[in-house]
Amino acid sequence: MAADAGDTVDMSTTSRWAGVRGGAAYRVEVPANWNGKLVMYTHGYRGTGAALTVSNPSIRRHLIQQGYAWAASSYSRNYYDVRAGVEDTNALALAFNEIAAANGRSLAAPSKIYITGHSMGGHIAAAAVEAEAIANARNKVRYHGAVPMCGVTGDMELFNTFQAMQVAAQAIAGVPAYPVTRW
């Protein structure tokens, strides 16, 4: 598989496989100096269109350069479907060794599997490590850690707290709550 334009990962020392499993596109990348750890990346909201793609977040290059394997799924459909994101990402994590073997690279099972994502992907990463998902998912993965980067992973109480803090800060600073004319 050819490198994307501007990609700075050394493709001569990194195995890179892409395909479709269960209706979801995927990409898996494993450096020659693999440290035995796998990071699953979950992308953000992509609208409702039919095109299913795997993104190249900036953290990907850093992880591969540090010896981590990296994998990501497009999910089997677009929309704000956290469950589909969890299931498709977990299915890909479980297929990691099978994909490597099918491409001629025999690897030990990952010693640790992590999950991270941005925006809706952060919501998916957070949901993937919750007890409910671990108990009820069709594709069960027990992640060793998660870094969900998403503002909507809090509930309404959290947002009400943020709103109250904002209003209090504006009152203390003497800034009108609404409308704000000078940013």
Give the residues covered by each predicted segment.
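Gly/Ser-rich "nucleophile elbow"/oxyanion-hole loop immediately N-terminal to the catalytic nucleophile
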Residues: 33, 92-119
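Short beta-strand element of the alpha/beta-hydrolase
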Residues: 36-46, 114
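Conserved alpha/beta-hydrolase
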Residues: 42, 60-79
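Catalytic nucleophile-loop/oxyanion-hole region of alpha/beta-hydrolase
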Residues: 74-94, 100, 107
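Short glycine-enriched nucleophile-adjacent loop
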Residues: 122-137
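Serine-hydrolase catalytic-loop signature spanning alpha/beta hydrolases and amidase-signature enzymes
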Residues: 46-49, 70
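N-terminal cap/lid segment of alpha/beta-hydrolase-fold proteins
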Residues: 1-38
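A catalytic-pocket lid/entrance helix-loop region that shapes and gates access to the active site
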Residues: 134-183
